Amino acid sequence: MDGTNERRSGLMAFEQFLSAEEIKAVQLAEAHSDKQQKRTAEQIEAIYTHGQNVLVSASAGSGKTFVMVQRILDKLKRGIGIDQLFISTFTVKAAGELKERIEKKLNETIAETTDMELRRHLSAQLADLTKADIGTMDSFTQKLVTTYGYSLGISPQFRILQDETEKASLKKEVFDQLFADYLEEDENGAFRKLVRNFSGNRKDNSGFRQVVYQVHDFSQSTSSPTKWLKEQAVQADLYSQERIEQMLEQGFKEKVLDKLYQAADFFRYHVEWGRNDFGSAKYFANVEEVLDLLTGLDSLDQKDLMERVERILLINNQSRGKGLTNANRPKDEHLIAFKEEYNAGKSQIISELRDLGQEVYELTLLKDYQVQALPLLILLRDFVLDFSQAYLDVKIKEAAFEFGDIGHFAIRILEENADIRQFFQEKYHEVMVDEYQDNNHSQERMLDLLSNGHNRFMVGDIKQSIYRFRQADPMIFQEKFELYQANPQSGKLILLKENFRSQIEVLEATNAIFTRLMDRQVGEIKYDDTHSLVAGSPGQKIAQPKNEMEYLIYDQQDSANSSTDAEEETPLTAGEIEVVAKEIIRLHNEEGADFKDITLLVQKRTHNDLIMSIFEKHGIPIVADGGAASYLQSLEVMIMLDTLRVINNPLNDYALVALLKSPMFRFDEDELTRISLQAGTGFFYQKMEIAQQASGQHPELMSEKLKKKITDFLSILENWRAYAKLHSIYDMIWKMFNEKFYYDYVGALPNGSKRQANLYALGLRANQFEKTGYKGLSRFIAMIDRALANDKDLADVQEFLPQNAVQLMTIHKSKGLEFKYVFLMNIDKRFNLEDHYQSVIISRKNGLGIQYLADMKDKVNSPLPQVRVLMNTLPYQNNLQELKIANLSEQMRLLYVALTRAEKKLYLVGKGNADKLAEKYDGKKENGVLAQSTRESMATFQDWILAIDEAFSGEDLHFKKVFVTDEDLTEEKIGKLTLKSKLEDASLKDIRQSEDIAQALDQLSSVQELNERYKAAIELPSLRTPSQIKKLYEPILEQEGMEVMEKYQPKRTFNLPDFSKKPKITGAQVGSAVHELMQRLDLSWLVTEDTVRAALEAVHAEQAIKDKINVQMILDFFDTDLGREILANTDKLHREAPFASLQTDSVSQENFVLRGIIDGYLLYDDHIVLFDYKTDKYDQPIQLSQRYQAQMQLYAEALKKAYKIDRVDCHLILLGGERIEVVEVNI
């Protein structure tokens, strides 16, 4: 019997799950109810369907989170425990929000129900919510491996390898060693040939290394990397000569026939309708000859067909390439049009026949050389296998793993241990997953292993799958969708189409674009009635014509600054941003729109700085979610890194000169030149030593002042170098800050707070680096240098940001959010197609497709010893086409996500020359959709939308184009923000007469007299908290150690006033965050840095407050005696326990209720261990012990009364010092 049946077979009789007929009854009742916001029939079905796999396809804004919460709540009300549900979310933040919603609904249900048994059950679920399996798949697999990793020999004391620079460093070390081993054993030169194939003429192995990383990373997204590499990566038959011959004889023959039949129809039409007017022309005889060649095609094989093609091309090449061109000069307009149409059609046909000829030539050539690539491919696969194993061995040795490793360990544990797998399959009543469209194959395998085969609940929307770069595979969702659609016995498919977010103008525009853009061929799904958005409430259907979607196009009238070249990059321009600024000013001034309701979406953060500078010019507040990572390039950090480089190695000339010129030492160009001239060769440090002794080639250039400056520098540097040998990098950095006042110096510069935050973060990152197990300045510098060399900069430090401001974020960041006004910026930006030019393209199904560097010396008459030609193998070409469709489909989904963020109004923003754009698009369409060839050939959102506008110009597309020129963007026409007026001072003449004021003052005086008379009773609250009691007793407690001064002596200090607008973080804020963190911390598993940070992520506090919490100190607490006792007795643990106690005030003898929340206690049979967290700053622990003695005594008395236990041991956990301290309080 599984856990579900055991729980439901208890004493309490829970309601049974609804049958299909009962669900229909609920749907009918809901439809006829008078609710203002009714649940849809599909939402009800998704909430109550039970006993089978369910896939919910939830369109944007359809309330999928509402459905999930309601479904979970329904299961809890029917006797299922929260611990019997496995709920996977895409992000930690989403998990926290889901828990909050469940908690809120549970509290509401508990308050409403009168059934005491149900209340007890739901209260138990509320208490267990923090321990429930609601989180990311990564967090679950981490817990699973911590608990059961012993079965694979994995220590539970592992850490997560999250730092990209550390990962890159480890991978490089493993690769270099393996590369050297392979090179040493390469007797026949096969490995050198492999490396040359991917590195070309470069002298290093970087090209080959990137290929190895690429294949390795792809394999990690599969459920079994080793199995995929061995069984799928190399598919030898795809590289065989037989495969090309088969393609030429079968598939390609049909392609050639199709083109020739099209040509026959075209030329035959021209002969029939043009004989009378052009029959005597020279080209006409050539056309008739071509028609003769286009007869009897069915009986020809592929080789004969290509001979016909070649003969047609030869005929066309006559008369200098005009053999089939109508060169006549008719005067009749109809004949002119007929001639031009013929010439254009003929040119396209000849071009397509040439392409066919080239394709056949390349395939024939490939047939001889492609097979030579197979041994290299096998060797590449073997190298990647060895690299993957060696890399994993290093991570095992370091006890540091990537999330992908943890996922694969978890899969192995469940696959190889039937008892563990059975435990989880029996434990979970249902396996639920949110954002199912973004699952990868490793996560899908985990869900399969946790499920019993008929208890999966999956929610997602394939149209919002935008994480292919993380190896998410939307086809996992689509295959389930099609399976359940075709065979309901396999599972239930439920469509949530109603959108409850956007007004009808947004929905209609989105549908109009996507019904004409997305289908199975390009888009991977057909956007039809199944996927179209429908307004979910009557209010959304009320038309607001002014909110029709607008396509704002910055008209680049200067043709020299505009281009419609498909290959030319189109960066965001100042003109486009001015267009948006102008509209935002209008929205704010005329429609009263708040800045916080407006969001700008971009595809990349590359141009965030430009956007923010222009908005700042117009006074528009704006907040960005981050720019291009440039932390290591910030000037203050670069100077400190150069300082560390010099400390590590004074012979580093570049770093040394940078340090000398820095504000810390201020050597100028003249002084540096004088030093440099003291010796012709050698390092600059050596020249400084020579200059100091005035023994160089030009001692006359050295003044006493300069020599002293050099002496001071060398002395400081020697001192720093000696200090660095004995202390941590963190201490070294702060020593430099303090001795040279550099931290204070940058604080006085523009953006000083940001610069100081950067320096502070450098110290923290150095400290974090040393906690990973790595030690030493040289290794830290090497890690930083590798990060810079690999363009792996660190994230910028965030500052406090204004609340009422326009938001600027990427489309990816906006997913799941909603905003009243949305501007999609730079839609003429080209898609990122870099992966189309890789030397290896990978398909999950077809394996590796590679480019092969063939030696064609035998085909080419050349004096050179080798003639190497880079060939795209057939598998490479097939994988490239698959990749192109996948990338274009992803871009369509990205556009869909962007458009569906808007609630009220949507703006698209692009640019181009109006005249050129009008001529660019051909208007081709097929079956109500933009022509496939058109969609495949385009590489911007703008091209797609304007091509739709051209192809379907006679239809209502629910958006309007607005061209904006520079003349529309003058300072006068843009306008200025109208700020809200300040409150004007009140005038006495506008208020009541003076006698009324006098009467009011008399009444207030009498009230004051009464207040003074009964002050004691008035100030006694009926409810008090322990903190209030503590404050009451504090003056008395502190008197014992009080010294009375004869005379007041003010402290002679001067503190600069704080002019920053950033609110200070108070101790109370940090304390509240710490308390919430300790409440959220899951103590049922091993407490690690990752579990603490995961809990910290869910804490409701500003990031700046969270940054003040010392995670290491939290970890250190669980290494104390009390911490270990708590972990060993979680069954006796009570956290955040509310209490109430009746007390008597010692002054007024009035009764009052003391209420509070105890941080935590362990309840034993004969005694209680009480503990409380304190984040106060202190010099000696006894200070806090005395300060909180009275408060702890109140807690202890309340517990004694509640449990009838006399012994309560009290402890304060002090988190406000330099290290963790646990102090026992005597009461």
Curated annotation (Swiss-Prot):
Give the EC number. Answer: 3.1.-.-, 5.6.2.4
UvrD-like helicase C-terminal domain residues: 532-816
| Record keywords | ATP-binding, DNA damage, DNA repair, DNA-binding, Exonuclease, Helicase, Hydrolase, Isomerase, Nuclease, Nucleotide-binding
Residues at which ATP binds? A58, S59, A60, G61, S62, G63, K64, T65
SUPFAM superfamilies named in the record: P-loop containing nucleoside triphosphate hydrolases, Restriction endonuclease-like
Which CDD domains does the UniProt record give? DEXQc_UvrD
Domain UvrD-like helicase ATP-binding: where? 37-503
InterPro entries cross-referenced by the UniProt entry: AddA, DNA_helicase_UvrD-like_C, DNA_helicase_UvrD/REP, P-loop_NTPase, PDDEXK-like_dom_sf, PDDEXK_AddAB-type, Restrct_endonuc-II-like, UvrD-like_ATP-bd
Which reaction is catalysed here? Couples ATP hydrolysis with the unwinding of duplex DNA by translocating in the 3'-5' direction; ATP + H2O = ADP + phosphate + H(+)
Listed under GO biological process in this entry are:
double-strand break repair via homologous recombination
Needed cofactors: Mg(2+)
State any GO CC term: DNA helicase complex
Q: Which Pfam families match?
A: PDDEXK_1, UvrD-helicase, UvrD_C
Q: Which residues form a coiled coil?
A: none
Its annotated function is as follows: The heterodimer acts as both an ATP-dependent DNA helicase and an ATP-dependent, dual-direction single-stranded exonuclease. Recognizes the chi site generating a DNA molecule suitable for the initiation of homologous recombination. The AddA nuclease domain is required for chi fragment generation; this subunit has the helicase and 3' -> 5' nuclease activities.
Family, per the entry? Belongs to the helicase family. AddA subfamily.
Could you give the subunit structure recorded for this chain?
A: Heterodimer of AddA and AddB/RexB.
Name used for this protein in its record? ATP-dependent helicase/nuclease subunit A
Q: List the taxonomic lineage.
A: Bacteria, Bacillati, Bacillota, Bacilli, Lactobacillales
Q: Which gene encodes it?
A: addA
